[in-house]
């Protein structure tokens, strides 16, 4: 509450210096029982919305640059689920928490797979599984252990 233009600029400078690629950002709203509810909030909703847009835009830009830097790299990906949009495609998270999409005939949900990043469009990362035979053996072994 009550963030000045100077304080907001300091926040923006910090975000640029650290080079955040993700952030959960929202407009301040008082929460009952918290110390912040006692502070004066003289920032208009219009300014709050403008600042949030600016902050989210810079983080989005930084995220796109970071995602593009992954192109051509090999990433270890923990497979989370099937794509709801594309048949035969799965997605998972790399160690940097970026979501990676890839095609597979095998179901590797819950397994790690090695993926070569082959394209990045805006902030959407696509790749191809490498070492698929090794991963299939690992998957089958995990399934046998579970029985």
Summary of predicted features, one role per range:
Residues 38-147:
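Terminal RNA-binding accessory module
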